[in-house]
Amino acid sequence: MLAKRIIPCLDVRDGRVVKGINFEGLRDAGSILEQARFYNNELADELVFLDISASLESRRTTLEEVMKVSEEVFIPLTVGGGISSVERAREVFLHGADKVSVNTAAVNDPYLISRIAEKYGSQAVVVAIDIKKVGNHYMVHTHSGKQITQYEALEWALKVQELGAGEILLTSMDRDGTKEGYENNSLRMISTAVHIPVIASGGAGNLEHLYDGFSKGCADAALAASIFHFRHYSIRQAKEYLHKRGVAVRF
């Protein structure tokens, strides 16, 4: 059985880690480097660094910040935000990222996924999918959740898999920052339909929510921010809890 992964996420804006609710109302959650060092020492399986305003503001992720984080951590580092070309992905890799996450740019130019995957391998390409329930449909949103697209979540997930994505980071905008648990219906729908790993994101408020993301949502990994940033739980506590409940995790 493949071990399930626990992945803290650094949402970065203006050089600081921030956290909001439903993609709004951001509050400060500490220093980028302090949080990165903490998670590197905390048994995190990977670390995600998302410049959450890069696409919205039509700018690029700060490479200097990426490099500083990569020098501090010895776990896989995924970087996203404003990556809209193979050349930009190359720069991010050269500054220490192990994977790149594309979101808005992939919706605007789906074959960007293929171009990056062909050059660096599918394992290096994470497609972040931000979804919100509209009526009875889960719709994909871009530009930090500000713009709705024509894609339904499952349709887009299958498409990015076909184009060469190695992993999907699925965030429920409805649950983001609420601490009410992952949106396991959409998570299960997509996890069981694709053959690439799916990372659950948006809503983790306690350790049972992590367990539910794996058991009910069929996720391959669980991403969380608030519960770890503000030290409600440690990564070790999360893994010990999951292990006791029969979930395979790495220590």
UniProtKB/Swiss-Prot annotation:
Q: Residues in the active site?
A: D11, D130
Supply the alphabetized keyword list.
Amino-acid biosynthesis, Cytoplasm, Histidine biosynthesis, Lyase
Q: Which InterPro entries match?
A: Aldolase_TIM, His_biosynth, HisF, IGPS_HisA/HisF, RibuloseP-bd_barrel
Q: In which pathway does it act?
A: Amino-acid biosynthesis; L-histidine biosynthesis; L-histidine from 5-phospho-alpha-D-ribose 1-diphosphate: step 5/9
Q: What Gene Ontology molecular function terms does this protein carry?
A: imidazoleglycerol-phosphate synthase activity; lyase activity
* A GO cellular component entry from the record: cytoplasm
Tell me the compartments it is located in: Cytoplasm
**Pfam families, per the entry:** His_biosynth
What's a GO biological-process term for it?
L-histidine biosynthetic process
Task: Name the enzyme group at the top EC level.
Answer: lyase
* Primary location recorded for the protein, binned into one broad class: cytoplasm
Q: Which domain of life is it from?
A: Bacteria
Q: What is this protein called?
A: Imidazole glycerol phosphate synthase subunit HisF
In its UniProt entry, the species of origin is given as Chlorobium chlorochromatii (strain CaD3)
